[in-house]
Design a protein with these regions (language model features):
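N-terminal Sec signal peptide and the immediately downstream disordered periplasmic leader
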Residues: 23-39
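Primarily extracellular Gram-negative trimeric autotransporter adhesin
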Residues: 17, 33, 43-44
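Gram-negative bacterial Sec-dependent N-terminal signal peptides
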Residues: 2-24
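Gram-negative and organellar
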Residues: 27-30, 44-102, 106-750
């Protein structure tokens, strides 16, 4: 079979080659001219979509026997008034792209593009006992119990299937300029992902992984995003004013996902009977689970912008934007269990959200060069996220076993915030070879419905550019930032109000893990140097370091730091030869503190024990890139010019975690195994000019991926070490692979 594919590919190339004849640089078509190119060929041994190459094929398509990597056509009139350009990449493949541009110079420009983005998860690796119809998942049979009975039922009824997404994207942009001062524009963007992706449908969460009741499913994805825009601009005498409208509409074909409960063993399909008996380990409960998918929504934004020139070589630009973001999709019912007699109205909740956000954005930038050696740039921006969504209060909710939830009534409040930023960036050219910079930025946030009502952050630092010689350059910079976030309060009434519980205990601890709102100190620095020791050789090196500290956070994330040195070189012995290589190393360190919440509100551990866990970790990686790009002139061996490209990439990463400490119950912290990945890729491409307008292109790709990750290596449909009551897809998108791909194409220019 492999030989037949190879012969078929070579035969196709020979047929195309026999049809070609010498051509001019362009083709005359009366008053018009045409030029372009087409490249077509074959992959003698395609890479199938299967588990062996799942990760390699994740965002590409090499499963086709015959390929058209590129096609281009350019049309124009001899008076150079009109133009048309058409480009196609990866024709008829899952990662195909087509673009068209045409118009009249100085008057009309139309650009259209369509492309597809594949996302391949796996092929017949995941398996499930469910049958899917739209967004409804049903079971034709049920297990007789949990544990071994659930395992046996899965082995007898699960069916393998493939999971992948294919997103189609279309863009159209039109610009019309009737006069040099006035222009109109319009654009449209369309996005449509379709396919399947993993989803965890849960009936109940317990206090540990061993008490989960999880039914992992896949999401049948079919939604649409429509983005529209239109605008006008008027410019004259160094000033510009413009207006834009931008609208976005999101539509989901599947608003609700439902699935049969395998652990309600009263019967399958219509024979199932709902039950109020429902615990983390028992049978029974509702016949179906239900979850809401992405809700339909829309957004409208109106923008006014302007720019102009002022005295002292100063330029100013600014914009104002106001919008309406709306979402009013119906709520799904509170429960799918018919034995729990409650509805949205019975608990005091509306039928839909009534979501209404009114964003406002203002921006002003001034760029000035008042004296020869001084450059100034100042920016002010203001963003207001005005959330006018009404608060919703729930009363008398029955969560399990027809028993009222102890935490009701509770109210869900919307959150709002506003942010102001002021930045100043002066640059002074001390000499012709030295430039000194200073960057300063002040940022303040005013919040409503968040744990911190106000946050203030100030960042500042110098930078220096030094270029003493044309062949030598240096750059160094440093930034320090401090964010002040006083008044942590997770029980603020403007948040989700929960009655019951102990203020300052568990609720406060949950807040202290919100590191995005915590007091923060940041130090960042970077260095860069480039030198040409000889004319043909360039050597460069860089180093960056980031350090984040959370001084007011007792529990949660305490500290992170990252640093990345790198070095590289390039060598150009001839104008037609280029060799390069670089090496980089990255490391990210972190540490956290956590508390055994089961001991609250009075955490008094036994003697010799502590209720605090500490964890430290490092994610690090190494990367090497080597390559060459050579344009080979004609010689005695090769009578016509040719082109050779070779590139090799090696990447290895390792993630480590170390935990220490015992809980008050004397349960030790768990140290998990290290995880990591390794990646190798070699790309070789050789192009030889058979004629002035005909070239043959031969390429070879080798790719290798390996991993050691206990979290995905043990994936299975039934995992008793995690739960005896749950079903999983058994899928992984981290499968190791070795891939060899060769291709041959013919390129024809006219």
């Amino acid at each position: 079979m492999n030989l037949k594919r190879l012969l078929a590919g070579c035969g196709t190339m020979a047929l195309v080659l026999s049809m070609l004849s010498p051509a001019l640089a362009q083709v005359d078509l009366g008053q018009f001219t045409a030029q372009g190119s087409v490249e077509a060929g074959a992959i003698p041994q395609p890479v199938p979509y299967d588990d062996a190459a799942a990760k390699y094929q994740e965002y590409r398509d090499l499963a086709q026997q015959f390929i058209v990597p590129k096609l281009q056509l350019i049309l124009g009139d001899k008076a150079e008034k009109y133009y048309v350009q058409f480009d196609a990449v990866n024709v008829a493949q899952k990662n195909q792209m087509y673009s068209l541009r045409f118009g009249e110079y100085g008057l009309l420009d139309v650009q259209a593009k369509f492309f597809e983005i594949p996302h391949f998860f796996s092929d017949h690796v995941a398996s499930t006992p469910y049958d899917e119809n739209g967004s409804n998942f049903s079971l034709s049979s049920k297990p007789t119990g949990t544990g071994a009975a659930l395992h046996s039922w899965l082995e007898a009824n699960d069916k393998p299937f493939d999971m992948s997404l294919l997103e189609g994207v279309a863009d159209i942009n039109v610009r019309y300029t009737p006069t040099p001062s006035l222009s109109f524009s319009a654009n449209m963007n369309y996005q449509n992902p379709t396919g399947q992706q993993p989803f965890g449908g849960s009936f109940m969460f317990g206090t540990s992984p061993g008490t989960f009741k999880v039914n992992e499913l896949w999401v049948p994805t079919q939604y649409y995003t429509y983005n529209f825009g239109t605008g006008a601009e008027y410019a004259k005498n160094g000033w510009l004013v413009g207006f834009q409208y931008q609208g976005s509409f999101f539509v989901d074909d599947y608003s609700t996902l439902t699935w049969d409960n395998p652990l309600n063993t009263s019967g399958a399909g219509g024979n199932c009977v709902d039950s109020t008996t429902f615990t983390s380990t028992s049978l029974g409960g509702p016949c179906q689970g239900r979850a809401a998918m992405y809700p339909n929504n829309q957004a409208h934004n109106f923008i006014v912008n302007g720019a102009g020139q002022l005295p002292f070589n100063t330029h100013v630009m600014g914009s104002l934007e106001y919008g309406f973001w709306l979402q009013n999709a119906p709520f799904i019912p509170l429960t799918s269990n018919s034995k729990l007699q409650q509805s949205l109205s019975s608990v005091g909740a509306p039928n839909s959200l009534g979501g209404d956000v009114r964003p406002f954005f203002a921006n002003l930038t001034i760029d000035s060069n008042p004296i020869e050696r001084l450059d100034l740039k100042a920016t002010y921006s203001y963003f207001d996220y005005d959330n006018q969504t009404p608060a919703i209060t729930f009363t008398g909710v029955k969560s399990l076993n027809d028993v009222a939830d102890a935490q009701t009534p509770f109210t869900a409040y919307p959150f709002s915030f506003s942010e102001q930023d002021v930045s100043l960036e002066p640059t002074y050219h001390v000499t012709d070879t030295i430039a000194a910079h200073f960057n300063m930025k002040w940022q303040t946030n005013h919040n409503a419905g968040l744990e911190v009502l106000q946050q203030d952050q100030l960042s500042y630092g110098p930078a220096l550019d030094w270029n003493p010689y044309p062949w030598l350059s240096f750059r160094a910079d440093y930034q320090h930032a401090h964010r002040d976030s006083p008044g942590y309060n997770n029980n603020r009434t403007s948040l989700v109000e929960v009655l019951g519980g102990t203020p300052g205990a568990i609720e406060e601890l949950q807040d202290l893990r919100r590191f995005d709102e915590a007091t923060l100190d940041v130090n960042q620095t970077s260095l860069y140097a480039s030198v040409q020791p000889i004319e043909k050789v360039t050597v460069f090196s860089s180093f960056s370091y980031d350090d984040y500290n959370y001084p007011s956070t007792d529990f949660g994330l305490q500290h992170t730091s990252s640093y990345s040195p790198s070095v590289g070189a390039s060598y150009d012995p001839l104008p037609t030869m280029h060799f390069f290589g670089d090496y980089s190393w990255q490391a990210y360190d972190w540490n956290t503190r956590s508390l055994d919440e089961s001991t609250l509100p009075a955490p008094t551990p036994p003697a010799g024990k502590t209720s605090v866990w500490t964890a430290k970790g490092r994610n690090q990686g190494n990367n090497i890139d080597l390559g060459m790009d050579i344009a080979i002139p004609q010689n005695r061996i090769l009578p016509r010019p040719s082109h050779l490209k070779i590139q090799y990439t090696y990447t290895v990463g390792d993630n480590r975690t170390h935990q220490a400490g015992d809980t008050a119950a004397a349960t030790p912290a768990i140290n998990y195994p290290n995880t990591g990945t390794e990646f190798n890729e070699l790309m070789v491409q050789y192009e030889y000019d058979l004629r002035d307008n005909v070239a043959i292109n031969v390429g070879y790709y080798f790719s290798n991926f390996g991993e050691h990750n206990f979290m995905v290596d043990q994936m299975a449909n039934f995992m008793p070490h995690a739960s005896a009551n749950s079903t999983f897809l058994g899928n992984t998108d981290m499968s190791p692979y070795n891939v060899n791909v060769g291709f041959i194409t013919l390129k024809y220019k006219f």
